[in-house]
Amino acid sequence: MDQIRLTHLRQLEAESIHIIREVAAEFSNPVMLYSIGKDSSVMLHLARKAFYPGTLPFPLLHVDTGWKFREMYEFRDRTAKAYGCELLVHQNPEGVAMGINPFVHGSAKHTDIMKTEGLKQALNKYGFDAAFGGARRDEEKSRAKERIYSFRDRFHRWDPKNQRPELWHNYNGQINKGESIRVFPLSNWTEQDIWQYIWLENIDIVPLYLAAERPVLERDGMLMMIDDNRIDLQPGEVIKKRMVRFRTLGCWPLTGAVESNAQTLPEIIEEMLVSTTSERQGRVIDRDQAGSMELKKRQGYF
């Protein structure tokens, strides 16, 4: 790779495509975790480039909590159909039977049962030995220290003190029976890189990333967009229309919007240049307990 002639975005693109191809060649049953967000959209775009003009040699897996934004579900189904991807959707049946609800049971229990346990169930059900994820090192401190090849034991647990060295572009993919890896092709990308690449490559994204007037409720310092009627208003709470957008997407009761007028990709990029906060500041699950994200990853989270 001629690093002198390549822009930094093309270098990142080449690195990610190399990682995706390595995993496809090295593992017998890989899968791409598809959470419908901007990083998943970029990762899917890179995977399609990696195997063009052929189709993806692995399926997409969406671990559904039942609480995503309606626009996310519509985008997911439309994207899978447009690109001819095999889409697997899994919900934790035990969580559904228990009626797990982020309002009633809290973000920690909701995430553990519907996301972490749901993911482990799906990986065991289909026997996947490698799972692509869209996490980036600039998002959060526990992700900053995680390798591109993130090894998980037979219980899908991550041990941050027992990670393999990654020298240059050499990755050690040897695993024992029952073990697996999570692979993060976007590890070295930043939020700014993601948005510039989306603009450069004209990648389709969920409209929630663009500012619009939306019904919003302010609760616990978070701007919560009301997506359906599964919420009980507390005394004094009022739903108002405000110009907001999302920097990150998840379950609608646990994902805060930000006030913004950025309605185009160039406006989002310009907004990011002066932003001083993390994109995940609006994710309740990142701060529902001390060391929240690392604890979740140790237990098998994405």
Swiss-Prot record:
Catalytic reaction annotation: sulfate + ATP + H(+) = adenosine 5'-phosphosulfate + diphosphate
Pathway info: Sulfur metabolism; hydrogen sulfide biosynthesis; sulfite from sulfate: step 1/3
The protein's Enzyme Commission number: 2.7.7.4
Enzyme class: transferase
One example of a Gene Ontology biological process annotation: sulfate assimilation
Keywords: ATP-binding, Nucleotide-binding, Nucleotidyltransferase, Transferase
NCBIfam families in the cross-refs: CysD, PRK05253.1, PRK12563.1
HAMAP family linked to this entry: Sulf_adenylyltr_sub2
The protein's assembly and partners: Heterodimer composed of CysD, the smaller subunit, and CysN.
Name listed for the protein in its UniProt record: Sulfate adenylyltransferase subunit 2
Organism name: Escherichia coli O157:H7
Gene this protein is translated from: cysD
